[in-house]
Amino acid sequence: MNIRKFLADRVRSAMSDVGIPNDYSPHLAISKKPGFGDYQANGAMAAAKAMKTNPRELAQSIVDSLDLSGVAEKVEIAGPGFINIHLENAWLARQLAESSSTANLAAQTEQEAQTVVVDYSSPNLAKEMHVGHLRSTIIGDCLARILEFNGDKVIRQNHVGDWGTQFGMLIAELETQLSDGDKPDFALKDLESFYQKAKAHFDTDAAFATKARDYVVRLQSGDQHILNLWESFKRVSLKHSEEIYSLLNVTLGPQDVRGESAYNDDLAAVVSELKAQGLAVEDDGAQVVFLQELADKNGDPSPVIVQKKDGGYLYSTTDLAALRYRTGELAADRILYFIDARQSLHMQQVFTVARKANFVNEWVSLEHHPFGTMMGADGKPFKTRSGGTVKLAELLEEAVERASQVVAANSELDAQEAADIARKVGIGAIKYADLSKTRTNDYVFNWDAMLSFEGNTGPYLQYAYTRIKSIFRKADLDLESFAADLNIYEAQEKALALKTLQFAEVVEQVASEALPHVLCNYLYDLSSLFMTFYEACPILKSDVPEDTRNSRLVLSASVAKTLALGLDLLGIEVMERM
């Protein structure tokens, strides 16, 4: 259940009973200090100011009308009008027992399910995926998982770069290599070197460059031979991306790919409609939409070119066509874009033009969720030692290799299990190190920090889960099916039970704000509270009464299930042991 929402509804009802207008919020939040209870409602002060009454007296009248019998052991007023709510241990135990028996652990949101399009990853198929693609791929995938978990219909869209002038050069190079007897899969086995070879060929061979430019025209006009070569290139490049997605445990599949080329037939119509509405006007031969809404400090409108002087289209045109498709064909209520912060103005422009042209209904939520950059120790964007782009595949391989060296310390593991654990730890460490940082900030990439089993890291959370699994193995019990009465007596038990129950609140917040680090911080706090509980409250010691032992096992099982579920929503796998 969502405790915060449950309590907020009760406090809001009491506020209404004492004559406070409904537009005043209870301002209910988790208390920052144990002495202030478990939750705190601060709405009386804002209401009292507007109503010109004493806030403490108003808070008292709210408390007098507040029905929390059987829920709170104590409700008290502190300071100028804070309402501190101390929850009953027995009530917490009942709620945890009920939530643990459900498949999802967390009550799904009561809001009506929406159709949500999530645009993420979207690599350029001309090149191999590099570290710059990591953040969009894993942050977007985390939100897609969470929104689905909350009951929304999620439509993933991998808006790959599969069109443009560079493809003339690449198709010409592929044709050359195929004429030498190579198969497409072999010729393109290393996309990076293939691209460099094609570029060098283009720069040094005038005849090749002429052919490449001709192939762009033939591609755009639908020449079947050129289209076949383009399809071969796309197929092999997408296969490279899918291998990365599989290794990253990302849910994107071939069915989610809808590249730039998918909108080619709609681009002329987009420009025509913008012209018909008087939004697009000719400027130096190009078609431009001038947005006064995004004017600069001098008052000059922001120009959005939708068609070049030579008749060609731009990213803005394609993105407008994609928006029309997503709100029309896909019937999206909400569209989330996970694109880095450098594209913020572009996304603002596209959203503004789409609204003005009525390409999207007014109720559709258009959201650009930007993110910062992965930095090296030198404070510059993460590169190889030679200053080149780091291939994502090589980064992930190194993560698994480094993790295997850590896992090798456990001599009880056979080779296959050790390799599986190393993969989960290495990939999980990379993903968690990224997801646990505030999305909008840059962060410094550090191997030692991310692979540590101490602190707010992926390996630490995976270890916390295996620690609980080992308790059940030692007790010769099945964690998933174990059942017993849950009783809460110790402070550490209450803190752990309360934190476990707050999972639903956290997931709902992440779904709304698209900030995965909030879930990461929650899981770290939960793991830390479990370690504190484990030290203070013995479970399997011989002098522990059976009912206490079983109760603590039930509590531990709830924590393990919550950890596994939370990590799964982050796209991180758990293991039986480490």
UniProtKB/Swiss-Prot annotation:
Indicate what this protein is called per its UniProt record: Arginine--tRNA ligase
**Where is the protein found, in the record's own terms?**
Cytoplasm
Q: Where does this chain carry the motif 'HIGH' region?
A: 123-133
Reaction(s) this enzyme catalyzes, per UniProt: tRNA(Arg) + L-arginine + ATP = L-arginyl-tRNA(Arg) + AMP + diphosphate
> What GO cellular-component annotations does this UniProt entry give?
cytoplasm
List the PROSITE patterns.
AA_TRNA_LIGASE_I
Highest taxon listed in the record's lineage: Bacteria
Q: The organism's lineage?
A: Bacteria, Pseudomonadati, Pseudomonadota, Gammaproteobacteria, Cellvibrionales
